[in-house]
Design a protein with these regions (language model features):
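Short, conserved beta-strand element in jelly-roll/cupin
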Residues: 27, 37-53
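A short, N-terminal "cap"/entry segment at the start of jelly-roll beta-barrel domains
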Residues: 1-24, 29, 34, 100-101
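Ligand-binding loop in jelly-roll beta-barrel domains
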Residues: 69-99
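Short hydrophobic/aromatic-rich beta-strand segments that constitute the beta-sheet cores
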Residues: 24, 54, 83-85
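Short acidic-glycine-tyrosine-enriched beta hairpin
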Residues: 55-74
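A generic structural motif
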Residues: 30-32, 42, 49, 70-72, ...
């Protein structure tokens, strides 16, 4: 597993797939990821535990957030948080900082 990612087109992986990648992500309160976007992949985030802010909107346990290709988002953990993230398709190097141009 690499930083929580366990399904995808990378090693090590429990299921090699170009169609999807899946990860269980753990964040500590205050963790922050800069605004970024994916040109190809759709990213689905399910909040399992905790509370986060993405693009100025707060989400909590049970919420599911869908970020479409070329839609930028930042991420801040407002509490210790566990999320499950699914990206479709699995495209390596498809993360770009800032807004889509």
């Amino acid at each position: 597993m690499i930083r929580g990612w366990f399904v995808g087109n990378f090693e090590p992986s429990v299921l090699k797939s170009k169609d999807v990648e899946v990860g269980v992500k753990e964040y500590q309160k205050g963790d922050y990821e800069q605004k970024h976007h994916h040109k190809i992949a759709t990213e689905i985030t399910a909040i399992i535990r905790g509370r986060v802010k993405m693009n100025g909107v707060e989400y909590q346990k049970g919420d599911i957030i869908v970020i479409e290709p070329n839609e930028a988002s930042d991420f801040e953990a407002l509490e210790d948080t566990i999320s499950v993230v699914v990206k479709m398709p699995c495209v390596l190097d498809d993360k770009y900082l800032g807004e889509a141009k």
